[in-house]
């Protein structure tokens, strides 16, 4: 199913049920199971709602059970610690009273500190690169696959992704475990830093399973 940016922003608008308890809507993005990126993004929003003055700087997530895209998700936030400059939160996502996902994040005051990133590999300007849908369509034009599968691979996403290296979606060649892409929201995402972080959390699972 296609997902516009407006659809994703609606998914990130959680309902507060009680102190540290939130509910998120679900959407059929990759079939009957909830797309993992949706749960990561919603869990980040739930945790951040309890730390309004700090910004997430690290997180880790564990998928415990498949989620049902036909049902909402309950997010229980546990306030592990609030220190002088850091806060730690744990979030458990539940459906039908059972945990489907476990999440932890650390939040930090805005201040200078050490930063780490991989070296820049001389990526070309994005204006000269094709978007992922165009690249995928070119690879699939001679593939004998069902139209439903083809449509799933080519469906619209809430972010525009422009890969630096073209990679076949069905038969990728052996390569180093590094992927360079340019990406941006496919529309106006506003100025809230939390929403931008949640969009990145959502996108993280797009690349992991290459959909």
Where are the model-predicted features located?
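Small beta-barrel nucleic-acid-binding modules, principally OB-folds
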Residues: 52-66
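HotDog/MaoC-like acyl-thioester-processing domains
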Residues: 34, 42, 67-140, 195
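Conserved small/polar residues in nucleotide/adenosyl-binding loops
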Residues: 209-211
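Intrinsic-disorder/low-complexity, polar/charged segments enriched in Ser/Thr/Lys/Arg/Asp/Glu/Gln
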Residues: 19-23, 58, 72-74, 102, ...
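Non-catalytic linker/capping segments at the edges of enzyme domains
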Residues: 1-20, 118-194
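N-terminal, Lys/Arg-enriched amphipathic/low-complexity engagement segments
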Residues: 19-51, 56
């Amino acid at each position: 199913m296609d997902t516009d940016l407006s659809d994703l922003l609606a998914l990130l608008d959680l309902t507060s049920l009680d102190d540290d308890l939130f509910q998120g809507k679900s959407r059929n993005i990759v079939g009957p199971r909830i797309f993992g990126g949706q749960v990561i993004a919603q869990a980040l929003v739930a945790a951040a709602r309890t730390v309004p003055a700090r910004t997430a700087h690290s997180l880790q997530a564990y998928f415990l059970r498949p989620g049902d895209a036909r049902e909402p998700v309950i997010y229980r936030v546990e306030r592990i610690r609030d220190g002088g400059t850091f806060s730690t939160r744990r979030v458990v996502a539940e459906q039908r009273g059972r945990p489907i996902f476990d999440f932890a994040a650390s939040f930090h005051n805005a201040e200078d500190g050490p930063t780490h990133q991989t070296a820049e590999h001389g990526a070309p300007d994005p204006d000269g690169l094709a978007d992922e849908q165009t690249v995928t369509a070119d690879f699939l034009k001679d593939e004998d696959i069902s139209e439903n599968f083809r449509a799933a691979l080519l469906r619209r996403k809430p972010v525009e992704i422009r890969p630096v290296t073209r990679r076949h979606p069905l038969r990728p060649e052996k390569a180093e475990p590094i992927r360079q892409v340019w990406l941006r929201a496919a529309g106006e995402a506003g100025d809230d830093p939390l929403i931008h972080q949640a969009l990145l959390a959502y996108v993280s699972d797009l690349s992991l399973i290459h959909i």
